[in-house]
Swiss-Prot record:
Protein name (Swiss-Prot/TrEMBL): Probable ADP-ribosylation factor GTPase-activating protein AGD15
Domain called Arf-GAP: residue spans: 16-130
Function: GTPase-activating protein (GAP) for ADP ribosylation factor (ARF).
Disulfide bonds: none
Disordered as annotated region, ranges: 203-232
Listed Polar residues bias regions: 206-232
Keyword Zinc-finger set for record: yes
Record-linked InterPro entries: ARF_GAP_AGD5/15 (IPR044520), ARFGAP/RecO (IPR037278), ArfGAP_dom (IPR001164), ArfGAP_dom_sf (IPR038508)
Length: 232
């Protein structure tokens, strides 16, 4: 849907009165570029009032730089009127002509305007350009609605291919599961029985003495008699 179609005649007439009142302001009585009297055109995205001759040069710059509207012949949107009211020639030139020499010769409007807006020759470094943020957002939303934009729904998870399934199955078989087992308990999930280690008791003192005596007796040898008996 065209946003201009939503502007009623009553609202359009109200916008015209507001713009005419803005043109009566001392800062807006002259063209923002060539200083000619009684401008009847404007750049809605730059927020400045310009004369008919300069409006033609602005159109040649492209709508990405300057969007030209007639004060009385075109339909204005509420956010465009609000931006013109908040900016105007004085505030606009504070940005575009910040470093312009005081007595600069503006003999050629075409060359001057292109250097001013396309090249940004006299803009201070780090300066922030006045911009109709609300207008830019509303235009983007309107463009999305007109183009039938629909938010994307989350896509389903991709199914695994045959090769991927085989690889995953192999990895699950090879990789040992991380389990926490306790001694003497049965892990019902893994069906693994852990046998506890037997406890070894220290032998008492009597057994130690007995074993030492036995070992000592084993080491003793039987001595032969001093004289061997002979038998006839």
């Amino acid at each position: 849907m065209n946003r201009k179609a939503s502007v009623s005649k009553e609202l359009n007439a109200k916008h015209s009165k507001i713009l005419e009142a803005l043109l009566k302001h001392p800062d807006n009585r002259e063209c923002a570029d060539c200083r000619s009297k009684a401008p009847r055109w404007a750049s809605v995205n730059l927020g400045i009032f310009i004369c008919m001759q300069c409006s033609g040069i602005h159109r040649s710059l492209g709508v990405h730089i300057s969007q030209v509207r007639s004060i009385t012949l075109d339909t204005w949107l509420p956010d465009q009127v609000a931006f013109m009211k908040s900016t105007g020639n004085a505030k606009g030139n504070e940005y575009w002509e910040s470093e312009l020499p005081q007595h600069f010769e503006r003999s050629s409007s075409d060359t001057f305007i292109r250097a001013k807006y396309s090249e940004k020759r006299w803009v201070s470094p780090g300066a922030i350009q006045p911009a109709p943020i609300v207008s830019q957002l509303s235009c983007k939303v309107s463009h999305l609605v007109e183009s039938g934009y629909k938010p994307e729904t989350p896509k389903k998870a991709r199914t695994l291919s045959l090769d991927e399934e085989i690889l995953l199955h192999h990895v699950l078989q090879v990789t040992p599961p991380e389990t926490r087992t306790r001694a003497g308990s049965v892990d019902m999930k893994e069906n693994v029985y852990v046998v506890p280690l037997p406890e070894f008791k220290k032998p008492n003192q009597k057994n130690e003495n007995f074993s030492s005596e036995v070992n000592q007796n084993r080491r003793t040898t039987i001595a032969p008699p001093s004289s061997w008996a002979t038998f006839d």
